[in-house]
Amino acid sequence: MNLNDFDFLLPDKLIADRPVSPRSSSKLLVSKKLEQFMDEKFYNLPKLLSSNDLLIFNDTKVIPTRLKGKRIRGNSSSLINATLISYDKDDCWLTLIKPLRKINIGECLNFNDGVKAELIDKSEGFGVLKFNIKKNNFSAFLSRQGFMPLPPYIEKRRASDSRDIKDYQSIFAKYDGAVAAPTASLHFDHEVLKDLEHLGVKSSFVTLHVGAGTFLPVKEINIKNHKMHTEWGCVDQSTVDKIIEAKSRGGRVIPVGTTACLLYTSDAADEGLGVDLGGRRI
C-alpha cells in the first residue's frame, strides 16, 4: 500500500483539542452492514450489544512522562520537550526530544527540581538521556513535574496542562507503562460500564503498553517498509477462559480499540491464547 493513498482533507475546525464531557456523550459511528452507517451517541453502546458478548479492554496506564526543560548555551537558553519512553540502565532513558536535531551529544539539559540530564546518544529520532536522579526516585519526580504526552496534532494547537492528567487516562487504567492512552477506552465512563453490566455484557482485560511508535510519523512511501517499535503486552489466563466461554455460547469477542485488537490477534496467531508477549513488534 502507498502512503499517499491515506491522504485526505480534514479541516482544522473539525479537530477538537479537548475531549467532550461527559466522556460518553461523544459520537459513535455504527456500521451494521457494508456501506450502511448510522450516527449514534456513545452512551447508547449497550443497546448495540447482547448479554452473550465479551468486551476486551486494555488496562494500561499512561505515565506523565512529558518533561519541559531548558537547553542552556552561554548566556542564552531555549525550551525543549522531552518524553521519556523507556528506562535503559545506569539512570539512562530512551527519550523523544524536541528539537533533538539541534542538541549535541554531551550537552546538558536542565529540568525543574534541580534535575539535569546529559545527552549521551541519539539515533532514529530518539535520544538517550543520563539523569542525575535515580530510577527509584523518578516516579515522585514525574508526579510533580511530568505532563501527559499529547498526540502531535493536539500539541500543534496547545500545550499539555493539568487537565490532561485526567482526560487522557481511562477510568480502568491499572498498570503503569504507556506513553499514550488506548484512545477507544477514553469514551467509557462509569455510567456506561454500569449499563453494560446491568444488561449482562461481560468484560475482561489485556495489557498493552502503548509505545513510542504512536508518536512517530510514517515516512516510508510503501507502508510495508515502515518499522514499528516494540511494545510490551500480556493476555492472562483469566481473559483466555472468558474468550473461550464467550465463543462457546455464541457471543462476540469485541476488543475495544486497536491496541486490544492487535494484542488479542497477535497472541492467538503467534503463540496460542494466554502468554506474556514481552517486548515485540505487533
Give residue ranges: language-model regions.
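Surface-exposed, charge/polar-rich loops and edge strands
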Residues: 1-266
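Single conserved hydrophobic/aromatic residue that forms the stacking wall/gate
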Residues: 264-282
